[in-house]
């Protein structure tokens, strides 16, 4: 069983205002920390926990063994949220939570290929049954596409140099391991830049992971479905870990928190002119100093919460 320290555990679930008899969805089961904390608060309620990683689901069966009658596990991508709920014959739920990013077990289990600190085959698939892996991205995607993902998903300012170096190296032989890729990235970045801004491979590894799993596309699709799936008065909690996710989350919530332009002179605002949701957190909630002392991965976490109005 793997060990995972859940970020913003109580804040994320407590912001949902749990109804003991309500139906809730944990779209990112991961290490099952949020699911466990939530399901303990249910009486007649039920929790649907989704993850595309079978390892996470197997692990959660152990962690939640005392609550299995209150949980339905679904192995699927959360971009299919509407279909998942329809298959379970659920019309609306009371709350949904997302904890985006890679769970500690995926980072810590070397063979999954997520970590630039451990040698492993280039993989990075959250769903081990999918075809596209980091190996295909690194060895087959054209230079222009690599530059695009490194810049867009990694905000890497040396995207062109790194992509050019990858292109040159893979012509000699396939790039097969995380260690090989790290050395190529280091060689492509000017020496002064390697000594600042954290690990030199951090941004490229993030970019490849996002591309392999279509993380931003999946989240954008899922959060739109979530907004339509929560009943009025219900809430959605989202933890993001990098600026791309947070920006996307902020934009979607901002869009739905505005109603259409209201004609002047109306004594009351008709329902059709009211926004779909309201923001509970004007500014994102971040980890306390106490949490940061125990979990360095919480440093970049931001929690945004909205309440559905109609």
From Swiss-Prot:
Q: What lineage is this protein's organism placed in?
A: Bacteria, Bacillati, Bacillota, Bacilli, Bacillales
Reaction(s) the record says it catalyses:
cytidine(1402) in 16S rRNA + S-adenosyl-L-methionine = N(4)-methylcytidine(1402) in 16S rRNA + S-adenosyl-L-homocysteine + H(+)
Query: Which Gene3D superfamilies does this one have?
Result: Putative methyltransferase TM0872, insert domain (1.10.150.170), Vaccinia Virus protein VP39 (3.40.50.150)
Q: What name does the UniProt record give this protein?
A: Ribosomal RNA small subunit methyltransferase H
Under SUPFAM superfamilies, the record lists:
Putative methyltransferase TM0872, insert domain, S-adenosyl-L-methionine-dependent methyltransferases
- Report the sequence similarity comment from the record: Belongs to the methyltransferase superfamily. RsmH family.
Q: What is the main EC category here?
A: transferase
- Cellular component terms (Gene Ontology): cytoplasm
* Catalytic activity, EC: 2.1.1.199
Q: Which domain of life is it from?
A: Bacteria
Work out whether the entry's keyword set contains Ribosomal protein.
no
Which key words are in the record? Cytoplasm, Methyltransferase, rRNA processing, S-adenosyl-L-methionine, Transferase
Q: Which GO terms describe its biological process?
A: rRNA base methylation
Q: Which HAMAP family match?
A: 16SrRNA_methyltr_H
GO molecular function annotations of the record? rRNA (cytosine-N4-)-methyltransferase activity
Annotated residues for binding of S-adenosyl-L-methionine: 32-34, 51, 78, 99, 106
* PANTHER family cross-referenced by the UniProt entry: 12S RRNA N4-METHYLCYTIDINE METHYLTRANSFERASE, S-ADENOSYL-METHYLTRANSFERASE MRAW
Compartment(s): Cytoplasm
Native organism: Macrococcus caseolyticus (strain JCSC5402) (Macrococcoides caseolyticum)
| Keyword S-adenosyl-L-methionine found | yes
Q: Its biological function? A: Specifically methylates the N4 position of cytidine in position 1402 (C1402) of 16S rRNA.
């Amino acid at each position: 069983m793997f060990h995972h320290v859940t970020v913003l555990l109580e804040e994320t679930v407590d912001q949902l205002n749990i109804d003991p008899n309500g139906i809730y969805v944990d779209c990112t089961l991961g290490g099952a920390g949020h699911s466990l904390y939530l399901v303990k608060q249910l009486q007649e309620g039920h929790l649907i926990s989704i993850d595309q990683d079978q390892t996470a689901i197997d692990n959660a069966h152990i962690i939640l063994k005392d609550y299995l009658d209150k949980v339905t596990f679904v192995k699927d991508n959360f971009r299919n949220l509407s279909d998942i709920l329809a298959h379970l014959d659920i019309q609306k739920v009371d709350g949904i939570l997302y904890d985006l990013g890679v769970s500690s077990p995926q980072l810590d289990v070397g063979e999954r290929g997520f970590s630039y600190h451990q040698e492993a085959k280039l993989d990075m698939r959250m769903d081990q049954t999918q075809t596209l892996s980091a190996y295909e991205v690194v060895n087959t995607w054209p230079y222009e596409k690599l530059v695009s993902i490194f810049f867009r998903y990694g905000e890497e300012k040396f995207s062109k140099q790194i992509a050019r170096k990858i292109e040159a190296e893979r012509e000699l032989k396939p790039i097969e391991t995380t260690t090989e890729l790290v050395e190529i990235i280091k060689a492509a970045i000017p020496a002064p830049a390697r000594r600042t801004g954290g690990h030199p491979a951090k941004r490229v590894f993030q970019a490849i992971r996002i591309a392999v799993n279509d993380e931003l596309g999946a989240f954008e699709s899922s959060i739109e479905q979530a907004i339509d799936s929560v009943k009025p008065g219900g809430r959605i909690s989202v933890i993001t870990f990098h600026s791309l996710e947070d920006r996307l989350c902020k934009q979607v919530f901002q869009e739905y928190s505005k109603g259409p332009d209201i004609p002047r002179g109306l004594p009351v605002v008709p329902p059709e002119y009211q926004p779909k949701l309201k923001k509970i957190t004007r500014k994102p909630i971040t980890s306390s100093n106490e949490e940061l002392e125990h979990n360095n991965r919480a440093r970049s976490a931001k929690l945004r919460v909205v309440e559905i109005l109609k």
